[in-house]
Swiss-Prot record:
Coiled coil: none annotated. The keyword Transport applies. Pfam families: ETF. Belongs to the ETF beta-subunit/FixA family. May play a role in a redox process involved in nitrogen fixation. GO terms for biological process: nitrogen fixation. It comes from Azotobacter vinelandii. This is Protein FixA. The keyword Nucleotide-binding does not apply. Keywords: Electron transport, Nitrogen fixation, Transport.
Amino acid sequence: MHSVVCIKQLPDSAQIRVHPVTNTIMRQGVPAIINPYDLFALEEALRLKDKFGGTVTVVTMGPPMAEAALRKCLSFGADDAILVSDRAFAGSDTLATSYALSAVIRKIMEDMPVDLIFTGKQTIDGDTAQVGPGIAKRLDYQLLTYVSRIVDVDTAKKEIQVERRAEGGVQLLETSLPCLITMLEGTNEMRFGDLDDLFRAARHELKVWDRVAAGIDTVEMIGLKGSPTVVSKVFAPKPRSKRAELIESHDSDPKNLAEAALAKLFTQHPNLEQEIAKRAV
């Protein structure tokens, strides 16, 4: 079984700041991390490898510094890693990114069939959840989104069964391979790399593919030229000036305090009392 895991290296969103004058993201000094949902995807691919054998290949599109993210994935147990890096990819939106990654996976399939493609459900910087489905569409793969757990894989029948988190419950889905899975935070925690994998990751000769090596003949479908979506502005929300209002009382009875708070609320929102009365009937 051959699984390809698409990951993204991005700035740690917990430490990102927006410049107060230019409204641009200040990346200086912000550490880079692997998109957390992509790590859940990697863990599921590695667990399938542990159970059924096979190969796990990790792919990322980004600048040369993304090599560190790939080596980290190798240290967890991935077998191979490909960095797709070219100035022509700069400014790619989700449409251009899915085009580029699907081309890379097609190139990989020239040497070895790909049974499963894993991505995180979305990245924490863009939150679009579009790249995974875009890859599946371009490769004509079955698509399973928002998967929380892989229940079973029948390698003989080439079928997979998963749990998909949906509003109000969990769906049990089954489809044929090959397919693409976008992973939620699952029931399995990310493993720690053992010493052998840590040393192997440090020595591993990464594949670095430019546009031509990835099999992309034209620049019209990648980068800014292939991106109909453009971010026009990034800004931090203005802080609200409103403050919480304190209701002072010397009455220690909780019921009386609650009634005082409700009276204040009904004064500010006259229709609210009527609405509550209707629902209580």
